[in-house]
């Protein structure tokens, strides 16, 4: 029988439509046509992007030239522009302000063909460190209230360029979905004097059936009330409110579980398009860090949001998270295939501190 499940953080209900239950092989494969031709993110084309605002490059090389490992530039076609004042104002009953913000692109690797999960853990750590540096810098601007970090992988997920990249957008408001999540966390904390994400980590670790993988610092799970098939959350086990406050050792552990989670998704689902979104605390006037807990949400693009979802806000998910977690645990990232590897629920294949071969 179908179930309605309530997300314990924001109170959102979803329908787990077991009558439509799907395993990975039941989903139609979304294949993005390979584009050929010029790529502005490839080494040698640095002059075709705005100047770099952050870079990890070989010592002695000049800015905006090749021989870099990670590169961050302003988006050539920004959603928000960094120049100007907010000029908040009313138009009758309506509110508006100038579209002030920042929009940056983090190029993950010089290699055009390498997807995020194929990067060595050390390279993913460089990417996460670059995210941290740029978020700290952008948060110094008093006009900005929130910094959204996200990745669109594949044309169906909104990617317009194939070369691996992450985007950062600083906004002058705290987006509604973030406010809903913060309010849900605060309500739980005021009621129980505990962080709800810490409670989720403790409960999921104890029952194990929705765990995808883990290490000493992070837990990767299929959430109890997922909006989408194989929606995956990566959550710090210790209470951490703000991503940009994370030390290098925590980021290294995060890199390992991120990589393994995406490897399992790619192997189980035949490399689907996906989005991942970083949820972290707002910047500037945000003071209370006791109740909010940063995390990453990964959403493979396997189904489409249609009229019922738009009209009601209820999502229909044909794959129970327990079945999704079990299937993701069956694949074997170490051997690069989808055969079961006998890994116990929640047991990582290898310590995250081990570096993969170059």
Name every feature range the model reports, one short phrase each.
Residues 1-358:
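HIT superfamily nucleotide-processing domains
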